[in-house]
Amino acid sequence: MALFDGTRLAVLDTETTGLDPGQGHGLVEVACVALDGGEIGETWSTLVDPGRPIPPDAFAVHGITDRMVRDAPGPAVVAAELERRCAGRVLVFHNVAFDLPFLDAFMRSAGHGPLLHAVVDTLGLARGFFGQGGNSLGALATRFGLPAEAAHRALGDALTTARLLRVLAARWESERGVRTVAELAAASQDALRLTSRRSRVG
């Protein structure tokens, strides 16, 4: 797809101990999928020791246990690898408002700076077409018939997000005239702001 020509992206997903890094919750898994010229390339994922017990409600979502993360790489190793894999790339998330605060808190805790990259949010791209509801990653994967991956594990969700991005980008290109990844990033953020404003008014 012409929109992706010459552009390098990193599709990221996380699994966590809870919903708010400000309350001490942290990463238990992170994944990165390279997307070069629109094609899925190298993938990487790792478990992360959050330094606290994984609560039952978090385990119920992703199935990751304290025993599984016990021998995970240290934060400095994971942060350095994540920084390397994201270098020079536009970042892609499904719901950046959830993942990025966790990643930034993790990077700071490991002595690294935040991931200051342009961002495309597939949640925003979906809301731009379908409105506020029904835009979970699983629901969108079903809507578009995307291959089933390991849901609520970081690599499975990152791969699904990468495939979803290609589907949604094609629609934004053909139906809304978006021509570059920079325009796609702006469109995703604009859609998130607009739907958020409508939900507050409604």
Q: For each of these PLM feature ranges, what is it?
A:
Residues 106-109, 128, 164-171:
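Active-site catalytic microenvironments for nucleophilic, acid-base chemistry
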Residues 1-4, 163-202:
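Acidic two-metal-ion nuclease catalytic site recognized across multiple nuclease folds
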Residues 42, 47-50, 88, 101, ...:
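Non-transmembrane, interaction-prone segments in cytosolic or luminal domains
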Residues 153-167:
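Acidic, divalent-metal-coordinating active-site segment for phosphoryl/phosphodiester hydrolysis
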Residues 1-117, 130-152:
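Conserved non-catalytic scaffold segment of RNase H-like nuclease domains
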